[in-house]
């Protein structure tokens, strides 16, 4: 029943964003709200369940990228930034900025996923500088701070919706900008 509740929750989220109700979730799959509460304490608990799964999937995919010795530091950074989980396919990321307002505690869980990725990228950036793949003049903490801010900007503002851009497209653009700059 848990997967059905999550599936219904995702469908309602994609229609209504964070303003969805557990009533609409229960109606969608023809169960009582009481049944939902047997599996989840609240709407935020369902978000947390999804984010925990996303975090685990990201961690596994990041580890696979980082342990692939055939990839350069730049390719690893690009891989970390553009890796996709099932949730990018299933969730409408254009509505995520509303979650920051509606459920700030849950949003902080999403920020933790961003921070874990930035930590891995920082290590690869430092390694790339050491190996001569990146300019030695790069200020690592500033670069990571800019990257983190850019990712959070995507998640906290309606930019994806305003520019009619998918999250994966935005992350590819960020990766290209970070690794290749904006000059022609």
PLM feature segments, named:
Residues 65, 69, 95-101, 154, ...:
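Secondary-structure edge/capping motif, primarily at the C-terminal ends of alpha-helices
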Residues 22, 52-59:
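Short, basic, alpha-helical segments at the C-terminal edge of helix-turn-helix-like DNA-binding modules
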Residues 85-122:
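Short secondary-structure transition hinges
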Residues 51, 55, 107-118, 144, ...:
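Amphipathic, non-transmembrane alpha-helical scaffold segments
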Residues 63-90, 144-147:
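Hydrophobic alpha-helical connector segments
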């Amino acid at each position: 029943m848990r997967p059905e509740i999550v599936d219904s929750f995702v469908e309602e989220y994609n229609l209504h964003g964070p303003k969805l109700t557990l009533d609409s979730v229960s109606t969608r799959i023809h169960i009582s709200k009481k049944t939902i509460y047997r599996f989840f304490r609240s709407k935020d608990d369902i978000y947390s369940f999804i984010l925990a799964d996303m975090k685990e999937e990201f961690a596994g995919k990041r580890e696979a990228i980082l342990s692939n010795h055939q990839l350069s530091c730049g390719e690893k950074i690009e891989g970390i930034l553009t890796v996709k989980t099932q949730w990018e396919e299933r969730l409408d990321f254009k509505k995520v900025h509303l979650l920051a307002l509606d459920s700030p505690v849950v949003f902080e869980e999403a920020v933790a996923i961003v921070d874990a990725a930035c930590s891995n990228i920082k290590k690869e950036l430092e390694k790339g500088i050491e190996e001569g793949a990146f300019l030695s003049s790069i200020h690592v903490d500033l670069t990571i701070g800019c990257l983190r801010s850019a990712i959070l900007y995507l998640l906290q503002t309606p930019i994806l919706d305003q520019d009619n851009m998918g999250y994966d497209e935005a992350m590819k653009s960020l990766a290209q900008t970070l690794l290749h700059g904006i000059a022609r």
